[in-house]
């Protein structure tokens, strides 16, 4: 945890506290087993993020985590070229840098800084305006996204932010509320980036219920009925 020196400004102390309050949450499991993230559907990760952009990484630099001279923690500062912003307009117009913990045990993200590869980046906006990204955010090479995922970034995912996506690990698995969608990729395919993650969004209907909407090519197999064992 960083310490604010007697010569630090209130702004620097506030920025450091905001940053390390987030880091403290990651450091608890990291101290034992490294970075650990709960499984989440891409839609849920985008709904939880304050910022969603498409960007290239121009360069990277290791920088101090705060202006506090007593703080020895480091961050990686990625200089980016923003291509498109999908979420976060009301807080930032253009993003020049994103920051991530230097240590992978604190969920730091390693990106290719060659100004060629494009990424979908999601993250948080700190009180000092810095954009923070980590492994528990949804960060993917743009070319790895399905056509349905790319189209869903504009509006479809955000239309379902009032829905709840529940991960199914075993049967029986059933909804407990009308605004719930069951995510079965892990149960059926033993992977998180399965058909539902790549081709489906959980959308709220006019009657308040939520259901899966297929925005891309149909999957190779239909989902099985897992409401009963």
Where are these regions (language model features)?
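Transition segments tied to proteolytic processing and entry into folded domains
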Residues: 2-229
């Amino acid at each position: 945890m960083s310490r604010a020196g007697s010569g630090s400004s209130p702004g620097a102390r506030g920025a450091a506290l905001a940053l390390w309050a987030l880091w403290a949450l990651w450091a608890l499991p990291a101290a034992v087993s490294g970075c650990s993230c709960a499984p989440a559907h891409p839609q849920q990760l985008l709904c939880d993020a304050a910022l969603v952009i498409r960007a290239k990484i121009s360069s990277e630099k290791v920088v101090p985590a705060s202006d506090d001279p007593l703080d020895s923690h480091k961050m990686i500062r990625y200089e980016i070229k923003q291509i498109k912003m999908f979420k976060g307009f009301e807080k930032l117009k253009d993003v020049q840098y994103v920051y991530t913990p230097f240590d992978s045990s604190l969920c730091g993200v390693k990106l290719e800084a060659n100004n060629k590869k494009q990424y979908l980046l999601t993250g948080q906006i700190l009180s000092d305006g810095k954009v923070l990204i980590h492994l528990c955010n949804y960060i993917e090479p743009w070319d790895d996204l399905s056509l349905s995922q790319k189209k869903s970034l504009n509006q479809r995912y955000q239309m379902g932010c009032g829905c709840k996506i529940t991960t199914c690990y075993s049967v029986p698995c059933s909804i407990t509320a009308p605004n719930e969608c069951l995510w079965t990729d892990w149960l059926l395919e033993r992977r998180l980036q399965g058909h539902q993650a790549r081709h489906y969004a959980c959308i709220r209907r006019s009657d308040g219920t939520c259901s899966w909407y297929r925005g891309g090519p149909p999957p190779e197999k239909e989902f099985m009925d897992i409401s009963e064992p």
